[in-house]
């Protein structure tokens, strides 16, 4: 049926192949920013992280790890919100791709709260309980199920208060919508290919819940957000 979730068929995205001209990559990253701004990506992240910030002691720095940061657009909107709330914050933004980090460096010049670190999401150079919150946006769908479970397990280990996974929801309707939208609003080859592929690479809410359980995450919620977003949030019971 059209309204049922299609089977997951993990395919590579062109951005992951890292062989496109970087001006084309930059243009595609700007498309991602627009998608996050107008299709709820930032809204979902800020909704959840605001709840963590409100419960954080005002006299202590709020320490965040952003996994697979890309252009660092997610840390930027988080820092903007923290500034509005007069909360002292530090965001460590991790990515394995040096080209991405060079691009992110240009974007965060006005954000001394953000610190870029090159490293592998599968083995980040951080110990247990190193951060108040770990966040990961539009990245989990790039990985196999086993890899995704390991990332959730690591996020749970590294965070003191919890973690936020903000990603796409696999569905035929979402695929059709983004396929049409990208043909209407962008000429970028990478965006036109990767956006529909991302939707079909994504997990469903039930799969997210199953993976969290497999990762040993004890206290979590999985919520759907319009349009076709999933928020997987872990909160420590003692937080």
Predicted region positions:
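N-terminal auxiliary segments of SAM/dcSAM-dependent transferases
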Residues: 1-18
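Class I SAM-dependent methyltransferase SAM/SAH-binding core
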Residues: 65, 71-123
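Conserved beta-strand signature within the Rossmann-like core of class I S-adenosyl-L-methionine
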Residues: 159-168
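C-terminal alpha-helical "lid/dimerization" subdomain adjacent to the S-adenosyl-L-methionine
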Residues: 168-215, 221
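Core SAM-dependent methyltransferase catalytic element
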Residues: 221-239
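A short, conserved alpha-helix within the catalytic core of class I
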Residues: 143-154
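Class I SAM-dependent methyltransferase Rossmann-like catalytic core
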Residues: 18, 22-53
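A conserved beta-strand element that flanks and buttresses the S-adenosyl-L-methionine
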Residues: 135
């Amino acid at each position: 049926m059209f309204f049922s979730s299609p089977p997951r068929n993990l395919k590579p995205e062109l951005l992951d192949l890292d062989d496109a001209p970087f001006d084309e990559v930059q243009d595609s990253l700007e498309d991602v920013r627009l998608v996050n701004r107008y299709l709820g990506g930032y809204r979902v992240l800020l909704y959840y992280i605001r709840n963590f910030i409100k419960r954080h002691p005002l006299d202590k720095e709020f320490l965040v790890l952003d996994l697979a940061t890309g252009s660092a657009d997610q840390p930027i909107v988080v820092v903007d919100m923290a500034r509005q709330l007069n909360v002292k914050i530090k965001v460590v933004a991790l990515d394995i791709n040096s080209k991405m980090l060079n691009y992110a460096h240009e974007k965060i010049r006005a954000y001394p709260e953000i610190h870029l670190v090159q490293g592998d999401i599968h083995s980040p150079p951080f110990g247990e309980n190193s951060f108040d919150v770990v966040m990961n946006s539009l990245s989990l769908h790039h990985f196999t199920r086993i890899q995704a479970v390991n990332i959730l397990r690591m996020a749970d280990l590294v965070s003191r208060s919890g973690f936020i996974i903000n990603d796409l929801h696999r569905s035929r309707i979402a695929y059709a919508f983004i396929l049409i939208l990208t043909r209407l609003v962008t000429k970028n080859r990478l965006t036109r290919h990767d956006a529909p592929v991302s939707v079909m690479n994504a997990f469903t809410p039930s799969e997210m819940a199953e993976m969290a359980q497999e990762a040993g995450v004890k206290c979590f919620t999985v919520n759907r957000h319009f349009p076709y977003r999933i928020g997987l949030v872990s909160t420590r019971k003692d937080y």
